[in-house]
Amino acid sequence: MPHFMLLLHSDPSGLQQLSPEEMQKALEKFMAWRNKPITRDGHRLTDDPGRVMRSQAGQIRTTDGPYSETKEILGGYYTIEAASYDDAVRLAQDHPTLEYGGTIEVRQVWGT
């Protein structure tokens, strides 16, 4: 069965505004989703903007972030099994990232 990456984009300050009780409830939702049978792998990423590496004129350049003008960052990922893109999108519709204002990019893993 094909594998798909769910790339989770969100504004990290959104979850930080939750009360401790709301944060616990959110964490439980994320963990429940991670434990679904379709999920093969998944992790949260740190809130820092990371680094972007580019080759320019034969030299490797490293910059902070991917985009300094946006608040949304790549905050995590999941690898899931699904029959098709449509199936992967349907399965991702109840992911808590969407509930908390984030977006999900769905991409098929090459060779699966």
Protein language model features and the residues they cover:
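Conserved, structured core segments of small domains
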Residues: 1-112
